[in-house]
C-alpha cells in the first residue's frame, strides 16, 4: 500500500495482524471477541444523495448559503479554553480561513507561517504574501524560517514520531513545531479545501482519462500489451518513459483505475524489485488496490465531480493528510482542527456544489466579508513547496528519474521501515 499510494490505506496497518477501525464506523468488543465494523457515516452516501437532489438556486443564494455554512463551521472550531492559532500559507484555503475566522468572531487569532531559507527571496517563498494577509486581517503573526541544518538535526525525531510510513507529513511536523513554539495548543488548518471544492488537477484529469480509455479498456489484452511495449521501450530511451504510460488502457476505463494512475507512485509490476517477489505477490493479493479505491464510491454518487470529492476525501485526505497531521501535531502536543473537513458542512453544501460548474473554490474565496487582496484571491494553486526531499536526496541534478516522490519513498523506506532495519 505504501509503495502504491504513498501511505498505507485503511484498514491495513504496518503490522500484519493489526487492522484499523475504519473511519465512520464502530465495533463491539466483549467476551466473545471483536465484532465486524459497522458503518454509521459515509462521504459517498452524502454525495450520492446530493447528486440525486442538487440545489437549483440562484448564484447569489448559492454563495450566501455556502458562506453561512463555512462561517458556522469555523465558529464551532474556534471554541476553546485556550488561545487558537492558524496555519497560514499564501494559498487560497488558509487565507480564506483566516478571513472567515475574523467573521466568526475571532479577535486574537495567532497566525504562523513556515518558511524555508533556501526559498527566501524566490517565487517559492510564501512568507511575504502570508504576512500581507495577516496584516490585512489584523492577526498576531509569526514567521518561522528553517534551513537544511535544522531539518537534519530534527529528522531523527520526525521518523520517531511517524507511526507508519508516509511520503507526506514532514511539512505538517515542522509547521506544527513552529506553532507550538509560539505557545499555541490549538490551531486551525485549511486542509480539506481542495478535496471539498475540486482544487486538485485530478478533478479534471481523472474524468478525462475515463472518457478517453472507455473503449480500449474493454479489451484486457490490449492493456497488457501496452504495458509490455512501454516496458520494453523504456530502457532504450535516454528520457525514461513513465511506468504509468502503458497502464492507461488497463486502468483508465474506470474511476477507480484512473484515480489509481493519477495518485499512484509505483505500479504493481514494479513491487517485486522493491520488496521481493513473494512479499509483493502476497501483498497485492491481500490489498486489492482497485477494490480499496472502489469502496470509496459505494454508494456511487454517479456524477464526476461528486465521485472525485469522494475519492480525494476518502483516500488521499483521510488515509494520508489527516493521519499525517495527527501524528505530526501530536509530536508537539498540538491539537489541529480542520473546519473544512466536517460532515455537517458537507451535507449543507454538497447539493449546492454538484449543481454548478467551474472553479468551485471561488465560493470559499468570496466568503470572507472583508475580501482577500485581489492578487491572493486570483492566485493559482501552487502547492506548499517543501525542500525536504532535496535536503535528504541532494539537489536532484544527477539523481536520475527517481529524484522526485518515488525516490523519496524508496529512501524513506530504506531509512526507517525496511524490515531488517527500522527506527
Write out the residue ranges for each language-model feature.
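Cysteine-centered catalytic environments shared across enzyme families
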Residues: 1-163, 172, 370-380, 405, ...
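Active-site catalytic pocket residues across diverse enzymes, especially alpha/beta-hydrolases
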Residues: 101-105, 204, 353
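Conserved S/T- and glycine-rich ATP-binding loop of Class I adenylate-forming
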Residues: 88, 190, 317
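Short low-complexity, flexible loop/linker segments enriched in glycine and/or proline
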Residues: 156-160, 202-204, 391-394
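A glycine-rich phosphate-binding loop feature that marks nucleotide/adenosyl-phosphate handling sites
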Residues: 90, 192, 383-387
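Adenosyl-5′-phosphate
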Residues: 16-23, 33-35, 45, 61, ...
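Active-site adenylate/phosphate-handling loop in enzymes that bind or generate adenylated species
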Residues: 174-237, 322-345
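Short catalytic/ligand-binding loop motif for oxyanion handling, primarily in non-cytosolic enzymes
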Residues: 94-97, 152, 195-199, 204, ...
